[in-house]
Structures are given as structure tokens and as C-alpha cells.
Amino acid sequence: MTENSQQPQPAPSTELPTQYTPAEVEGQLYERWVERGYFEADAKSDKPPYTVVIPPPNVTGSLHLGHAFEHTLIDALTRRKRMQGYETLWQPGMDHAGIATQNVVERELGKEGKSRHDLGREAFVERVWQWKSESGGQISGQMRRLGDAVAWSRERFTMDEGLSQAVQTIFKRLYDDELIYRAERIINWCPRCLTAISDIEVEYQDDDGELVSMKYGEGDETIVVATTRAETMLGDTAVAVHPEDERYKHLVGKLIKLPLTDRSIPVVADEHVDPEFGTGAVKVTPAHDPNDFEIGQRHGLPAIAVMDEHAVITAHGPFQGQDRLEARSAIVAALRAEGRIVAEKRPYVHSVGHCSRCKTTIEPRLSMQWWVKVGPLAKAAGDAVRDGKVKIHPQEMEKRYFDWVDNLHDWCISRQLWWGHRIPVWYGPEGEVVCVGPGEEPPSGEGWYQDSDVLDTWFSSGLWPFSTLGWPEQTESLAKFYPNSVLVTGYDILFFWVARMMMFGLYAMDGTPPFHTIALHGMVRDQNGKKMSKSFGNVVNPLDWMDKYGSDALRFTLARGANPGVDVPIGEDWVQGSRNFANKIWNATRFALMNGATVEGPLPDASRMSSTDRWILSRLNSVVAEVDAYYEDYQFAKLSDALFHFAWDEVFDWYVELSKTTFQAGGEAAEVSKRVLGEVLDVTLRLLHPVVPFVTETLWTTLTGGESVVIAEWPTDSGFRDAGAEREIETVQSVITEVRRFRADQGLQPGQRVPARLTLAGSALAAHEAAVRQLLRLQPEGDAFTATATLPVAGVEVALDLSGVIDFAAERKRLAKDLAAAEKEKAQANAKLGNEAFLAKAPDQVVDKIRGRLAKADEDITRITAQLEKLPEA
């Protein structure tokens, strides 16, 4: 029915321990896989390639749940493709994480009472490399614990010699093509880290600020502006108003006095100004605000910096040497003394950027930096998606992608750090500027020096899909494995990393995008949907859950929550539930082996099979097709759910249970069912393997005697279906489910046997009577049988004799009491929900709780009423 890829093997061992203990097997299995080279990729292979790069984790850290989530998805994809016969490369590596790594090492130096300046640049960089060699192995160890099937021999680091050559090469090409330039512009500046930082390193949060309105000018020619940053007024070079604002037309083009200074500044008309906001007039500080800088460029305004790199006021009279916050208060006080405060401080909540590393408030600062001219690069990145060369999953994320690449500003790529790829530009004594490519000798002689800045980390990670394959050399690996098949990453870095890879890949690789597909996932959150944060106290170390429940349990939990582009809540209870699933697989396979399940020989002809056998094989092939379709659409949650319910419900809870009487009876039917059970388990374990690799490896090799499920063949849908068998077993399931529900309603113990008469004459269900009786604990009816309850289900009648088993009068009394309680609960809930005054004051969660009580009361009333109707008269 489905192919088993293994050649005939020696009879497998049927011995499995009574319990599955992940800690005893996971580490050994992983090292065995690595030693046998299963995860390595051969560039000379004639197999079709399948390539995925790991989003390189920062060398500074350890894997968090977000990494574990992402790695689980990538691992599932690559394991499946390997089983499908692809030459599969999952490219591992780490990012040098410039500012983060430098901060970590600087803190270590601080404990020794030293700074990086005490060491000097060269010695400090050596110290960082030493730290990297001592700390970098932590992430690799965690990846092994998780089961990542990466090609370890190809592991890369963004500061490796080969990757450094790639960085220098593309910088030189972009520079020569006039796509890299140096200019003075506004950047995000961290006064603590003393560097420009990228947009992604800025965290915005609402801060409680104070809005102050102040009067500029003298006499009849005054204008009022409002600001939360009074300290920057020392650098104002204009006041801007909207050109159509009648209130200020008489002032446009005139000079007005700038308070606290000896300067006068012009009033300019600019359409950027919103005449409806505040007074309709805004102060313009081109050196300390990105929007003001743009206004300044349009009107030829000078840019006056009033703060140094530490955000301290520079040469401006009495405020010189004051921190920006100290100066803010001092300037407001000075303005008040001159009678220029029109409105005192008012509370004002506004979004303020903070450095993601040190949480310091970002200072927009005019600075000479290196930039990438992104216009043509961004257009190519947008067109690649528009033209269908690259697909984004889920498709609705395409709009966000276009919104960004179509409105992209030039990218500041220089950082005032020591750790990173140093900018390959030299300056000469006469103002010469020379960009040096790989293999070229830099200028020498008196007065020549290299730019002291390093490149933004995202610059080198933007080359990751091809630099890891040996570019700029035309290697066999580059020819075989570029472009990547898919990029799996979070939607949060769609703009910052994904788009940069698109721009650089298309530019460096002659218009070939770095990947065919971008599969975006959401963020991992706690079980209440709250963002995981140290400040919230809800951060989970994935190693803790792997130690407690096993790696498979964590992986399966993460995969079951992975809907494309949607955030993933996760709680420990869910991981424990996945561990229960692993135990269920283990116990069911152990039972099957103990009862002779086998994969030896071909499957018997369908004519020799029972309807139960044909049903499970029909369902198996449907699930194979279903899982394949979900994989192709990156629907990890749906494929995991499909496998969970098929394995647990259909195979273990129904097929195995329905087949027990067949096994006990022996004979040809039992032998056929043993072979069918072996086939179903073989295929199910192979289907489950990409998501839960460890437990499936142990069980599959024990069941089949095969070398490893890692290199087994991925199951294919044979096309076998039996709709009749599926309908028949669905009817059996309905009968069993309904009688079980009745037994539970009547308070019968699960193991309590009850006399019963099954009217199955002429029904296809007659063949299942033994199994039905065994599963429902039904005895033969006997001579004294009295039908006290009759259940018609799906054309079958089940009569039960509950005489002496249930005190019907007492049971009716108990149910009547429960019904009265449920009706009272319903009345109370309805009364509260009908009270408008209560609803107006009650918190939403209280109202929701009462609605839940009402729904529960309705369910109880329906259930108890049905039980009373079925209960025989005493």
C-alpha cells in the first residue's frame, strides 16, 4: 500500500524497555548520526539540491525558545527532503554580533577594572576572539540537544577569513558602482555604546514626557512652538509652518529672535508641517531630528550640533557640560525667567527609541557615516517578489514587504566599534580616499590611515546565503546549493535581514535571488499570549524543558503551534502533553512488537484483509497525501495535528484495540493484521520522524531492523482507498462511542461488565461483534436477560440489562438534583447578564466568566435531561 524503502533485513529485535527515557538515548543517537555523516552535503552529488541556511544566532548568547521553534521547523523540512532523496544542506553558523559581543567583552574587562581603551584596538580584538573560542561552543551544544540535522563540517562564522573576503569584495564592488558613499546625515546614536546603531537595534516604547510651549521672536513678530526636547532649541535654525496656514503667512521669510542665544532664525514654509497639530508651527533642529534634517535640506538650513557623543551640551554658555536631561530642565527655567513659557509642562505620552543593548535613550545625531544607496537594490528586491521569482508564505506578508522595500531610505552601514569587519577604506594626507579590495595592497606611507569604523552586522549577515558557500570564489558548493530552496525566519526580521539578503543576493549573483521561498513564522509567547521577557519573568530556557520531557516533546509542541506568520503560545502543560504522545507511540509500538507486528514480506492482497485492515491502510494513504500537502504549504501545525490524531486516535486507540481480538484468535487473519500493523507503524514512524526524530529512530530501527530512519525513504501515497471500509469502521466507532457515553452517564465503572444483546443480523458490523463486546465490556445476554435500556445507533440496536447494577430510583433522584442546580446557575447568570448597570461597571473578564458559566449550565441541562430520558423507570 505504501512503499518501504528498506531492503530485506535480519529479523529485528522486539525488545524495547518498558518506559521511554529520552535522556538515555537522545545524545547517543545524535552523535551516531553525526559520525555516520548523515547530515553532510556533497556538492558532487547528482541528487537534486535542497538548501536552507540557519538564521545565524548571535555568538554572545544561548538558544532561546524562539531559536528552538525556528530550528524545529527547518529541521523538519530538511529531514523530510533528505528522506525524499534530495542532496540536503542545512548550513550552520553564527553571527559575530558586533555591538552585542563588544558589550559583553567590555563588561568582562570592567570586572578587571579595565576598559577597551586600556588594551588598545588590536589587543581588544584579540581578547574578543579569545572570548569567542571559549564561549561559542554553547550554541552548538544546544543545537545538538535539539536534534538539528546540520552539516557541521560546513559551520561558518561571519568573521571567518572566507566570509571576511566576501564582505570586502562586495563593499569594493558597491563602492566602485557608486552604491556606497560617505555623507553626513542623521543617525540613531547610543550615548552609552558610543556608536551609530541600526533601526532593528532601536526599541521603541511609550514614555511619559512633558510638552512645553514657548515663544520665539520679539514684539509683534512672535511665534509659539511646542516641544518635549527643550534642550535641542539651542540648535534650532528655523521655525517651519505650512505654506497655506493664514496665521503665519505674514511671518514667512522673516527672521525672528531665538531665545537664550544671540541668533535670529528664519520662518520657512514647508508642506511637512501639519497645521492642525499644536500651534501649527514647529521648531527645526536639523542636527538632532531626522524630519528636521530633511526640512533643513530642502531649505538650505545650517545644522548646528549642540551635544557631543555622550549627549552632553557643548559650547552653549551656561548649559555647557550639562547632560541632556539636566539641560532640559535648566533651559525651561531660563525661558520661564524671560517670560517665554506660554504653557507650562503638560503630560505627553510619546514613543521614544532606546538602545536594545543598554536601554539608553537614543539620540538622533548628525554624523559622518558610510551609507548604501539602496534605491536600485531595493527595487530589484521588490521586483523579485512581484515577478514571482520569490514566494512569501503566508502571502499576506507580501504587503508588509513591499511597504518596506518600496519606501526604503539609504542604509547607514558604519559603526563606531572595534569588533567587526573594518571598513576597507584608507585616507591620505591630501584628502585622498582609497577603497581596497581583496588581494589589493592598501596605500602606505606617512599620513595614510584606515577608517576606524566597522560595518553593521547586518551587512555581513546579508551575504550569508552565498558567502557560506565560498563566494566570491566560484566553488562547487556555490554552483550546487545556490540559490537556497527556502528561508525560514521570523516576520520580525523580514525587513532587516531578509530584505538585505535579497538586495545583496540579486546584486552579487547576477540577478539570481538568494532563495525561492520565504516562509515566515511568528514569535513564541507564553501560554497566555504574552511576550516573553526577563522583565515579565516568563522567559523559559528550552534546555529545562528538554531535560524534563525530552527534545521530541518540545519539538512537537512547537511544531503543533506553527501556523504561518502567527505568534505561537506555549506552556509547560503542552510540552508535558507532547511527552505523553511520545510515550503513547512507544507503548503502542512495544505492544505491536510483542504481538508479532512485522514488516517482513510484501503486504497481503486486499482480498485477504479484514475491513479493519483495509480501513487503516486507506486512512494511512490519505494521511500521507495530507501531510505532503501541508509540508508544501509550510503548514506545520496542521501536519503535526494530522499525524497526532492519526497516530493516537486511529492507529493506537482504534486499529490496535479493534485488532486485539484478531490477534488473540490467531490464524491467517491474525498474520495478515500483524503485517498490516507493521506497515502502518513503519510508515507512521517515518512520517513522524522529521518532527520527533529521536523516539522514531529508536522505534523504527527496532521495528524494521533498518540502519536509520534518517536515511529511510519518505512514504508515498499508493492511491489505495477503501471508502466502504471507512464507512463501516466509522459505524463501529459510533456504536462504541455512544455506548461508552451512556455507560459513563450512568456511572458505570470502565471495567464493569454488563449483559447486552447486539442486533447485528445482516449488518456488516456482525464481523466486529467480538471486538465491540470486548471494548465495551459487554457480556452475553443469558437466560434471565431483561432489556432495561435500548440504544439505537447507526442502524444497530444495543440492548443493556442494568438490573442490579444501578439503583434507578436513586440515580433519578441524583440527576434531578443536579438538573435543579444547573437551572439555578443558568437563572443567576442570565440575571446578571441582563442587568445593564452591572454590565456597564463589570470588567470584561468578569462578564466573560459569567458567559462561560451560562454556557456550561446550558450544556449541563442538555446532558442531564438526555440522561433522565434514557434512564429506565424504577
UniProtKB/Swiss-Prot annotation:
Coiled-coil parts of chain: 805-871
State any single GO MF term.
valine-tRNA ligase activity
Q: Where is the signal peptide?
A: none
Localisation: Cytoplasm
Q: Where is this region: Disordered?
A: 1-22
Q: What is its EC number?
A: 6.1.1.9
What keywords would UniProt list here? Aminoacyl-tRNA synthetase, ATP-binding, Coiled coil, Cytoplasm, Ligase, Nucleotide-binding, Protein biosynthesis
The question of whether Lyase is a record keyword is answered with no
User: Which CDD domains does the entry link to?
Assistant: Anticodon_Ia_Val, ValRS_core
Classification via Pfam families: Anticodon_1, tRNA-synt_1, Val_tRNA-synt_C
Q: Where is this motif: 'HIGH' region?
A: 57-67
Catalyzed reactions per annotation: tRNA(Val) + L-valine + ATP = L-valyl-tRNA(Val) + AMP + diphosphate
User: SUPFAM superfamilies, alphabetically?
Assistant: Anticodon-binding domain of a subclass of class I aminoacyl-tRNA synthetases (SSF47323), Nucleotidylyl transferase (SSF52374), tRNA-binding arm (SSF46589), ValRS/IleRS/LeuRS editing domain (SSF50677)
Where the record places motif 'KMSKS' region is 531-535
- Annotated positions binding ATP: 534
The record's listing under NCBIfam families reads: PRK05729.1 (NF004349), valS (TIGR00422)
Q: What does this protein do?
A: Catalyzes the attachment of valine to tRNA(Val). As ValRS can inadvertently accommodate and process structurally similar amino acids such as threonine, to avoid such errors, it has a 'posttransfer' editing activity that hydrolyzes mischarged Thr-tRNA(Val) in a tRNA-dependent manner.
Family, according to the entry, reads as follows:
Belongs to the class-I aminoacyl-tRNA synthetase family. ValS type 1 subfamily.
What domain comment accompanies this record?
A: ValRS has two distinct active sites: one for aminoacylation and one for editing. The misactivated threonine is translocated from the active site to the editing site.
- In its UniProt entry, what is this protein called? Valine--tRNA ligase
Native source species: Streptomyces coelicolor (strain ATCC BAA-471 / A3(2) / M145)
Primary gene name: valS
